[in-house]
Amino acid sequence: MGVDPTRLPSLKNQNQNPNAHIAPNPARLPPFLPQIRPMASFNAAGAGAANPNPNKSLEVNPAPGDAVSSLSFSPKANHLIATSWDNQVRCWEVQPGGQCQAKASISHDQPVLCSAWNGDGTTVFSGGCDKVVKMWPLLSGGQPTALSGHEAPIKELAWIQPMGLLVSGSWDKTLRYWDLRQAQPAHVQQLPERCYALSLSYPLLAVGTADRNVIIFNLQNPQAEFKRIQSPLKYQTRCLAAFPDQSGFLVGSIEGRVGVHHVDDANQSKNFTFKCHREGNDIYSVNSLNFHPVHHTFATAGSDGGFNFWDKDSKQRLKAFSKCPSPITCSTFNQDGSIFAYAITFNH
């Protein structure tokens, strides 16, 4: 598909003018190509006639053996990490010509759900169903070491560069802050419910919980909640993305809808929600939200196999890509926004 000028309807006009259109703005389209896609292995005989790669994206090999749960690019180089339900953490180097070279991998005892890099791109962190945070000094070739972890699976990780700390969010209803010089957490923050999503734009930390709350922390005072916000969406939170200017966040849910929400009460008139990843009466989960690091437009990816680029300020969909035949489980941009990586999962 080409540029889709469909306007994102605001809460105010959503029912009054659901088919409003405005002209596209190609100047806001960042250089998103190439797209890289780790792809879980699948039975080709069961895949049907649908084109498994309709956007002609580059594919990494060897592919993970099960669903990809997270993707993370190094902040310093085009090194891509994928975590997977096959208990593996894999790294590829995306070379200038577009080739993807497998570099290294490590294992967990159970499925891995999340990943993050440290600020200088030397170390990878991973966590998952074995309840352990692993610290992998990838660039030095060292062996991973384990932090003490959580009492339930670890769903989210983020590196807080100004503080030199790692934060992990778990289904044990806690956030834990880690000083890498010690195995025990520097601070344990209680949450009202299980952590389902987390996004960081320092000093803003947004945490989505199982009760549809979004907990806002000002990391200049991390031991106290700054604000607790009820999600503007009616159903379970799947993903979050903090605004690059720290003024708010995007929230995506299982109902095929995204909320654009500001933290400051004075900006509540700017809040709106919009529908996406729907086809007729079929509604698909929004699985991933990513801001472009330069242009601050954003991407959504969903269980309909589609990914789209949007501009929240002009309320435009900038580009809709051809849908893959299977769900997209996660996605991310590289450090300068020149590469967009996404993972699709085929049923065995």
Regions found by a protein language model. Give the residues of each.
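A short helix->beta-strand "capping" segment at the edge of beta-propeller domains
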Residues: 41-66, 96-100, 271-275
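WD40/WD-repeat beta-propeller blade N-cap
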Residues: 61-68, 105-113, 147-154, 182, ...
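WD40-repeat beta-propellers
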Residues: 71, 89-94, 133-137, 157, ...
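Loop/turn segments within WD40 beta-propeller blades
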Residues: 71-77, 115-121, 157-163, 191, ...
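Structural hallmark of WD40 beta-propellers
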Residues: 77-81, 121-125, 134-135, 143-145, ...
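Conserved strand-to-loop turn within each blade of WD40 beta-propeller repeats
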Residues: 83-86, 126-130, 162, 168-172, ...
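Structured C-terminal portions of repeat-based eukaryotic scaffold domains
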Residues: 217, 221-348
